[in-house]
A protein has these predicted regions:
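Acidic, low-complexity intrinsically disordered regions
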Residues: 1-109
Length: 109
């Protein structure tokens, strides 16, 4: 099961919440369906909800990351930071990522 790290991006939304992403070291990212220079769509489960999300990677970066912008079941934009904080996760926290094809579940470390 890959391990991720919730990173703050030092950019803030209008309400003051810092943008966040989940980064995964490429050495542990093999089960994730990522490709360099492409945004690969995934279903991200956090708590009891699921979201449309994207995995990104570039050849020069040592990590794969879950992009900070999501869509909920109704197609509305929602931030990964808001979803994570509403479910008790915080910046700099380590997490497990349970991977089942293109479905990724965020679990506490």
């Amino acid at each position: 099961m890959p391990r991720g790290h919730i990173r703050g991006l030092s950019q803030f939304y209008a309400d003051g919440l810092e943008r966040m992403e989940i980064s995964i070291d490429k050495h542990n990212a093999a089960p994730l369906p990522y490709q360099h220079n492409l945004r690969i769509p995934i279903t991200l489960h956090v708590g009891t909800q699921q979201y449309e999300a994207g995995l990104r990677s570039t050849p020069n970066m040592p990590v794969v990351w879950v992009s900070p912008d999501l869509r909920d079941n109704h197609g509305n934009k929602v931030s990964l930071a808001r979803v994570l904080t509403n479910n008790g996760f915080r910046k700099n926290q380590r997490v497990y990522l349970e991977v089942n094809g293109r479905v990724v579940t965020v679990l506490p470390f």
